[in-house]
Regions:
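Oxidoreductase cofactor-interface core, primarily capturing Rossmann-like NAD(P)-dependent enzymes
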Residues: 1-2, 8-115, 127-130, 148-149
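A hydrophobic C-terminal alpha-helical subdomain
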Residues: 120-186
């Protein structure tokens, strides 16, 4: 029997929640058991949902930075493929990221503009969000900081090499998530 662990992309080592993933990976490697590690990129759905609407335009703290976003369905497909043939994938670490997407590109897909806000303003808005759990503002600030400074745009062929179909359109997925998050006024 082998174990498959869904971890965090290698490009995510600067994220505040990366150490827990890397420590778990090490424990798995040291266990003596058969293993495969799927280092998942951040979701296109999350990227789009993190864009904030201000009237008819979107805002973010991402600046010109890109995220090598991946569709959650593609990650699920890869996990099923790996689980279907664990011996073939034993001892492997796959970095499952997609193509780089920017907030500006998502805004363009939506037919609207994008405005960059400062990281301090972004943190303030997160802290003022009443439904967030205590860990969420620092986690999301960490993601925004890493995207803004170019740490999460690295690509890899692993996702497409493992999929039995073309990777889903992450720009369209991010735009759909941003559109779904748009406030509706009656």
């Amino acid at each position: 029997m082998g174990y498959t662990y869904t971890s965090l992309t290698g490009a995510g080592d600067h994220l505040g929640f990366a150490p827990a993933h890397r420590a778990t990976e090490q424990l798995i490697r040291d266990s003596g058991l058969s293993w495969t590690i799927l280092r998942n990129g951040l979701y296109a759905e999350l990227f789009g949902a993190l864009l904030m609407w201000d009237g008819d335009a979107v805002e973010s703290a991402f600046g010109p930075g890109a995220l090598a976003a991946v569709a959650r369905e593609d990650l699920a497909d890869v996990a099923a493929i790996v689980a279907g043939d664990p011996a073939r994938h034993a001892g492997r670490v796959y970095d499952l990221v997609g193509v780089p997407v920017t907030a500006q590109a998502v805004a363009g897909q939506l037919g609207t503009g994008h405005r960059t806000i400062g990281l301090g303003e972004y943190r303030r808005r997160l802290l003022d969000t009443p439904d967030f759990l205590p860990f969420q503002p620092p986690m999301l600030s960490s993601i925004a900081t890493n995207i803004r400074h170019g740490f999460l745009g690295a690509t890899s062929a692993d996702l497409q090499d493992l999929l039995d179909h073309p990777a889903r359109d992450v720009l369209a997925i991010a735009a759909a998530a941003a559109s779904a998050a748009r406030p509706q006024f009656s």
